[in-house]
A protein has these predicted regions:
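Catalytic center-proximal scaffold of phosphoryl-transfer enzymes
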Residues: 2, 6, 13, 20, ...
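Short, flexible loop/hinge motifs at secondary-structure junctions
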Residues: 1-154, 198, 227, 233
Length: 451
């Protein structure tokens, strides 16, 4: 029979305390492992969906609206309309009687029904020859020669429609050069080279310089501006696309880095007349502005991660508070921004209470979030004080998504002069701005090519 060992109370208390510390450390490490293994994905952080390890069973921040799928009551539908002036009419007349077999060729036609088919005719290249004629002045004998249009600068060259179409396919439809070459050959019977397409984009971006500059000036004095950035590769090296946008304008620029120097270079003095919406990246928060608004979509994804993997009560409460603020935003009237209702005051008070908690025992990453929110407390609920300030930066993320799709489809920007990303940024800025203002993209590119 084993003999019971007696230890002093002081030693027992020490072992008990050490055991409790080990349990706490063990739980903390388990929480961190859970975060590192499956915590960061496109739903719970700003990580892109392509980096998700497991893409099944996706959860969304959206909640059911209660509406049925499809068109909603009051929605104006669209369907094919017959033309009153068809370009071609084909008559189908009966030749013999289907009952007795009598020949009906000489019988006049009576009533008829009609059906229409819409198609696109084959597109073939059209060669236009420009001739510069000479005339001798009968008065002084001077030989005068006709002047070619400014854009006709070579013995033979491609026209503006070819240039605009290539730019449309490359920048707006994301196609790589090789596919554009194949499309022109198969659909138009025109054999382009990849070098020709690169030259088209170079000329078009040069012509877009003045519009690009105007967009930058308008963005800097806009009442609300959102900003974001994303990585890309240019000739094998890491670069960054930065975007500044609002409801009417989009300005994109490519840089070799993502520091605050980019903001200083593009927008000296910052946005002192604008409400600035962004994520919590330091260079964005450092940008001078009338007031900042943190992207709540980013914050909600982080809180969802802590709720899902840590079962954090604090994160659940903060997430519920931000969702309540978003619901209140949709219900507020113009007068509510002049005289804040009680609910706005209550939400601000509850936010202060949540940020005043003792977070020393929180998970390390959750602590970092709390500290970040405390530091930027005045930038969390700006949207409840000003009508035109959005609560998220989704507009900037939509602008960035076009760039990510381009790099996914076409790969990196590879140009001998290293300016491919700059050309894309210019032309895409013009395209996105035209779209936001309800203008035809192809017509705008054609106008640039003809200029």
């Amino acid at each position: 029979m084993e003999e019971m060992v007696t230890i002093p109370r002081s030693e027992y208390e020490g072992l008990k305390s050490e055991n409790a510390q080990l349990h706490a450390t063990n739980q903390k490490l388990r929480d961190e492992i859970a975060l590192m293994k499956g915590g960061r994905d496109s739903r719970t952080s700003s990580t892109s969906p392509s980096h998700d390890i497991c893409r099944s069973n996706r959860n969304s921040l959206r909640v059911p609206s209660g509406k049925k799928s499809g068109g909603q009551p009051g929605h104006t539908g669209h369907h094919l309309q017959m033309s009153d002036t068809p370009e071609q009419v084909i008559d189908h007349t009966p030749e013999v009687c289907t009952d007795c077999g009598k020949n009906l060729e000489d019988v006049p036609c009576g009533s008829y029904t009609r059906r229409q088919e819409i198609d696109v005719p084959p597109i073939l290249p059209v060669y236009t020859e420009h001739r510069s004629h000479t005339k001798i002045c009968p008065s002084c004998g001077m030989e005068n020669r006709g002047v070619y249009p400014c854009r006709i600068a070579a013995p033979i060259q491609y026209g503006p429609v070819v240039e605009a179409t290539a730019a449309y396919l490359s920048v707006y439809q994301y196609l790589p050069y090789k596919r554009i070459v194949q499309l022109f050959k198969d659909c138009f019977g025109l054999c382009l080279s990849e070098g020709s397409i690169d030259s088209f984009l170079n000329r078009l971006s040069n012509k877009a310089t003045s519009i690009y500059g105007n967009i930058r000036e308008l963005i800097q004095c806009a009442p609300v501006v959102g900003s974001d950035e994303t990585g890309c590769r240019v000739n094998g090296k890491k670069h960054w696309f930065h975007v500044w946008q609002n409801r009417w304008l989009t300005f994109i620029v490519a840089f070799a880095h993502r520091s605050y120097e980019v903001v200083e270079n593009c927008f000296p003095g910052g946005f002192v007349h604008s409400f600035y919406v962004s994520d919590c990246y330091a260079a964005q928060l450092k940008t001078p502005a009338k007031a900042h608004q943190l992207c709540l979509a980013h914050l909600l994804r982080e809180l969802l991660r802590f709720e899902k993997h840590l079962r954090s009560k604090w994160s659940i409460k903060m997430k519920a508070l931000l969702c309540q603020a978003l619901e209140l935003k949709e219900q507020m009237t113009d007068d509510d921004y002049l005289n804040p209702p009680t609910k706005v005051i209550e939400i601000n008070n509850r936010l202060d209470e949540l940020l005043a908690v003792d977070f020393s025992k929180f998970n390390r990453k959750e602590q970092a979030l709390v500290k970040r929110l405390i530091k930027n407390r005045d930038s969390i609920l700006t949207f409840l004080a000003y009508k035109n300030v959005p609560p998220d930066n989704n507009g900037s993320e939509r602008a960035i998504r076009n760039i990510k799709v381009k790099t996914k489809v076409s790969g990196q920007f590879r140009n001998s002069d290293g300016k491919g990303a700059d050309r894309y940024a210019k032309i895409r800025s013009v395209i996105d701005t035209k779209i936001k203002n309800g203008q035809d993209v192809y017509a705008a590119l054609l106008c640039l090519a003809e200029g």
